[in-house]
UniProtKB/Swiss-Prot annotation:
Entry keywords, A to Z: Actin-binding, Calcium, Cell membrane, Coiled coil, Cytoplasm, Cytoskeleton, Endocytosis, Endosome, Membrane, Metal-binding, Repeat
Protein name: Actin cytoskeleton-regulatory complex protein END3
GO cellular component, one term: endosome membrane
Residues that, per the record, bind Ca(2+): 54, 56, 58, 60, 65
Role of this protein: Component of the PAN1 actin cytoskeleton-regulatory complex required for the internalization of endosomes during actin-coupled endocytosis. The complex links the site of endocytosis to the cell membrane-associated actin cytoskeleton. Mediates uptake of external molecules and vacuolar degradation of plasma membrane proteins. Plays a role in the proper organization of the cell membrane-associated actin cytoskeleton and promotes its destabilization.
Region (Disordered): 343-363
Protein encoded by which gene: END3
SUPFAM superfamilies linked to this entry: EF-hand
PROSITE patterns xrefs: EF_HAND_1 (PS00018), EF_HAND_2 (PS50222), EH (PS50031)
Organism of origin: Podospora anserina (strain S / ATCC MYA-4624 / DSM 980 / FGSC 10383)
PANTHER family associated with the record: ACTIN CYTOSKELETON-REGULATORY COMPLEX PROTEIN END3, EH DOMAIN
Family, similarity comment: Belongs to the END3 family.
Biological process terms in GO annotation: actin filament organization; endocytosis; endosomal transport
Statement: the UniProt record of this protein carries the keyword Cell inner membrane: no
């Protein structure tokens, strides 16, 4: 199963992001610096993480890019990477920015070439004349099928439509041929535009037309930027889909494409599997917890190596230095474990913030009391001055 950002992580990242941006949509380098530097990574590593996450190169991080940066940092701290990766893994690329990543790869000459489907032996009884144009009715039907099989990232895999394949008059080899045609990179999932093209090919094959062997250049480009021009070369010619089907023909007697599948499926069968960037929680202790766990793992590894070394000295003179080091490491390990427990239970240092808040509230109360007393003192002094003036005036009048 491919890795992904879990909803709990997204919730934590969202609270950090929303707190730093005060409800804004972008995080500047100045805003992000305190959070990122708390990870303990070197500045040069953080710079590379920033460049990696800033997919659109606008100098800021939106929420999806911030999630990418945080996940890369956590993976570095947890030992998933020895150093900052040079490119983002495919599963970590935000859906909304996949076209930018593809464009950057194309500029660097890393874009996989579109494969041409090999010519196969022509099947008897199939017709030529495949048309890439989609009528509004067909497009609507394709979108309904897509909605029932997509995951939360808006992508769809081959097996998600297995029930549809069973309802069609299309051989399995042709189904896979159509899939390979619109998925030349052999990805596990495809986006909406590629899915609609895939369903369109299956529709034509279901109606007795041969599967095309190539995809027009305009459609290939559209797949990469997630925008598809369904009317290739802006041709306005009438499509055969604009005319009413003849129910007397063998093709017309077939069930309309996807009708059986959609009727049988129902919308209640939809389950989400992808990363959802809409859920939201916050914890400044995340970095500390990760660091403590990493230190614990390092200490346990050191202890294991020392114990192996001691065991290797069978019958030899026991060196007191490894034993002393082992005791010190065990004590440090116990201390770190206690710190981690206190952190998880909200005890010890983790309560410093709440104590400071209580002291701050007490100080504010004292300030208010002092201000009240000073105000009362001023009013009494004014009364005293008034009495003194009246006494002086009385003396003068006598």
């Amino acid at each position: 199963m491919a890795p992904r950002i879990e909803p709990q992580e997204i919730e934590t990242y969202w609270n950090i992001f929303s707190t730093r941006t005060n409800g804004g949509q972008f995080l500047t380098g100045e805003m992000a610096a305190p959070v990122l530097k708390n990870s303990g990574l070197r500045d040069d590593q953080l710079e590379r993480v920033w460049d990696l996450a800033d997919v659109d190169n606008d100098g800021n991080l939106d929420f999806e890019e911030f999630c990418v940066a945080m996940r890369v940092i956590f993976d570095l701290l947890n030992g998933e990477y020895a150093d900052v990766p040079k490119v983002l893994p495919d599963w970590l690329v935000p859906e909304s920015k996949s076209h930018l990543v593809s464009a950057n790869k194309a500029i660097r000459g890393q874009e996989p070439k579109m494969e041409r489907v090999e010519d196969e032996e022509e099947e008897e009884g199939l017709k030529d004349g495949f048309d890439w144009y989609m009528s509004p009715e067909d497009k609507s039907r394709y979108e309904a099928v897509y909605r029932e099989g997509r995951d939360m990232r808006g992508e769809i895999n081959f097996e998600a439509l297995s029930d549809l394949y069973n309802s069609l008059d299309v051989p399995d080899t042709d189904v896979r041929s159509a899939w390979n045609l619109i998925n030349p990179n052999a990805s596990q999932t495809i986006n909406k535009d590629a899915c609609l093209a895939f369903l369109h090919i299956l529709n034509y094959r279901h109606e007795g037309y041969r599967i095309p062997r190539t995809v027009p250049a305009s459609l290939r480009a559209s797949f990469e930027r997630n925008q598809i021009d369904y009317q290739v070369d802006n041709q306005a010619a009438k499509s055969r889909w604009a005319t009413k089907a003849d129910d007397e023909t063998s093709t017309g007697r077939k069930a309309k494409f996807g009708d059986q599948y959609l009727t049988r499926l129902g919308r209640s069968g939809f389950t989400s599997k992808g990363t959802d960037f809409t859920t939201t929680k916050n914890s400044d202790a995340e970095w500390e917890e990760v660091r403590l766990k990493k230190q614990l793992q390092e200490l346990e590894d050191k202890l294991a190596r020392i114990e192996q070394g001691v065991e290797a000295r069978k019958g030899g003179k026991r060196d007191s230095k490894p034993a002393l080091v082992k005791r010190e490491l065990e004590q440090l390990l116990d201390y770190k474990r206690k710190e981690l427990r206190d952190l998880e239970e909200g005890k010890g240092k983790s309560r410093t913030g709440s104590n400071l808040k209580s002291v701050s509230e007490d100080l504010q109360t004292v300030r208010e009391q002092v201000e009240g007393l000073e105000s009362h003192l001023r009013s009494r002094q004014e009364v005293l001055e008034q009495l003194r003036r009246e006494i002086e005036e009385e003396k003068i009048s006598r």
